[in-house]
């Protein structure tokens, strides 16, 4: 019995041709080069160095960063609103406490109490009710006033990316007009004028204090924004470098595989005897 003839070279080449490891290195290198040169592929990695418009800066005020923290401008507005609420509560509550206690003592001269402690406790209850009632009225009004004023002023400053005295005047006009809008059109106009007149000297005072300190709030915000932008740009460069080196790592890993062993296994499989023909094919013959 003759030995089976060796597998033809053409069959080996045909089996080895579509094998995925043959042209993988070249394909990976081509993909790496095309990624570096193709700007469309590089666009999938977001570039933080692009210029920002006024609306982009304004939108970032209400968006949390990567650490789920609000912007410093919004933090300043919230802190100012809380401080204004506390100051307003003290401004309206303390005089109301004293007035309510005095008024209760004047109106309760004819009342009969069991002891002195009961009379003092009743007077303190009346004073506490006055403190809570009038303190809350002044508190929420002051907090809303300061919040609207700071929001408009900060929004204009961030949008235009500079400090200006007109921002304080516009913020005062908007705040005063909204607080007097319940009086109709005349109240809206009068409140806007009064707010602008009060906002202008307040803005002048704040800007003078900032210049005296040597650094304005906008300059500090600009420095913080530039530092964040530089940090994002550095992170973007690292991510881009990792993305460009990934195909090279894949290529080096594929080159470490020994193709001789794979070729030997394919030759052994091709030398195995063929499967016997099926009964259907024999009947056809």
UniProtKB/Swiss-Prot annotation:
Which terms in the GO cellular component ontology are assigned? mitochondrial membrane; mitochondrion
Name the residues that span the membrane.
80-100, 137-159, 165-185, 188-208
Record's InterPro entries? Answer: TIMMDC1 (IPR055299)
Protein's membrane topology: Multi-pass membrane protein
- Pfam families linked to this entry: Tim17
Any GO BP: mitochondrial respiratory chain complex I assembly
Q: Which UniProt keywords apply?
A: Chaperone, Membrane, Mitochondrion, Transmembrane, Transmembrane helix
**Keyword Transmembrane helix part of the UniProt annotation:** yes
Keyword Transmembrane in the entry? The reply is: yes
Compartment(s) where it occurs, according to its Swiss-Prot or TrEMBL record: Mitochondrion membrane
Q: How does it assemble?
A: Associates with the intermediate 315 kDa subcomplex of incompletely assembled complex I. Interacts with TMEM70.
Report the protein's function: Chaperone protein involved in the assembly of the mitochondrial NADH:ubiquinone oxidoreductase complex (complex I). Participates in constructing the membrane arm of complex I.
Q: Which family does it belong to?
A: Belongs to the Tim17/Tim22/Tim23 family.
From the Swiss-Prot or TrEMBL record, give the protein name: Complex I assembly factor TIMMDC1, mitochondrial
Organism encoding this protein: Rattus norvegicus (Rat)
Question: Gene symbol?
Answer: Timmdc1
